[in-house]
Amino acid sequence: MLKYLLFDLDNTLYSRHYGLENNVSRRIFEFASALLGIPPEEVRRQRMEARKQYGTCLEWLMTEEGFTDVEAYFAAVHPPGEADALVPDTELRAFLAGIPVPKAVLTNAPREHADLVLDKLGISDLFTHIIDVRQCNFFGKPRREFFEYALRTLGVNIDEVLFVDDHPFYVEGFLALGGKGILLDEDNFHSDYTQPKIRELKEITRYIG
């Protein structure tokens, strides 16, 4: 029995075409470039090599480079006004409100970013929990620890949750634990993906029984 819908935040609850996530990625690489003294392109290369070991750039920097000033990182990556392009989404609100299943957000971003985005979209009150990367010692998706923390927080078993994310790597991490996960692939970038996939959020109703 489905007891919870667990949503990623960025590029899942709003379209990737707003460009917010691209700007976040750019600021991450710029921050790491300044920190390490190497070009952003080299940061990107090293980060991609370490992607399977570290789900987030922050975890990579903390583990491999001994980085500790987490709040400086978040301040640089998530500046004021970063979500100004977003507007209240009344259609999304009506859709989510019409699903009679509790909903939560699981994000690799800090809580203040999640609050900002959800407030801009006008859907903050529709989620019982916002589970952010700070709550699990900065271990993010697809780390087992983060998923298990989310399940404990929600008080459910993994087979009672449907997880939706726009990153195959993160969905596959949830699937590997025995969960049910759906990839939101808005522009069909992952045409060879063999697990359940949707192009827009409204299609999740096919998987809610």
Predicted regions and their residues:
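Asp-based, Mg2+/Mn2+-dependent phosphohydrolase catalytic module
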Residues: 1-3, 97, 104, 110-111, ...
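Residue-level marker of regulatory loop/turn positions in helix-turn-helix DNA-binding domains and
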Residues: 84, 88, 106, 139
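Alpha-helix boundary/capping residues
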Residues: 50, 77-80, 99, 121, ...
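N-terminal helical cap/lid subdomain that shapes the substrate entry/recognition surface
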Residues: 1-90, 112
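Catalytic-core regions built around general acid/base machinery
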Residues: 91-100
